[in-house]
A protein has these predicted regions:
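Terminal-region recognition feature
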Residues: 1-123
Length: 123
């Protein structure tokens, strides 16, 4: 296989500035995705657990083949909208393996406004 030759100078000021900038953006993205993955408020999540119910992301995890990946899409839908009360627009959606077949999974997050839809949920 032919090797691709780069002309990027990893020691240049511009490279270092770009690297630092994009590293901050990467960390910001990770933080936002982790925040959204919490679902609704702590109170809502606790009420869910007190009723003996699984949290929505746990339900999704249990449907998937053990150890298989889940490619979530739309995790940042409605981010910064609705006063921050709509993580992932109240919906967990993605592609995963069930019985070794790729499937699309859609799960209403009942910890977010009881699982009701926001306008951004259907966009």
């Amino acid at each position: 296989m032919q090797q691709l030759i780069t002309q990027v100078d990893a020691n240049s000021e511009q490279y270092q500035a770009n690297f630092t900038h994009h590293d901050k953006l990467r960390q910001q993205l990770r933080d936002r995705v982790a925040e959204v993955a919490q679902g609704g408020s702590e109170r809502s999540r606790q009420r869910h657990l007190d009723r003996g119910r699984l949290l929505p992301r746990e339900r999704v995890r249990r449907v998937l083949d053990p150890g298989s990946p889940f490619l979530e899409i739309g995790a940042l839908a409605a981010f910064g909208m609705y006063d921050g009360d709509a993580p992932a627009a109240g919906l967990i959606a993605g592609i995963g393996l069930v019985e070794q077949r790729y499937v699309m999974i859609v799960c209403n997050d009942s910890t977010v406004k009881g699982g009701t839809y926001y306008p951004a949920t259907v966009k």
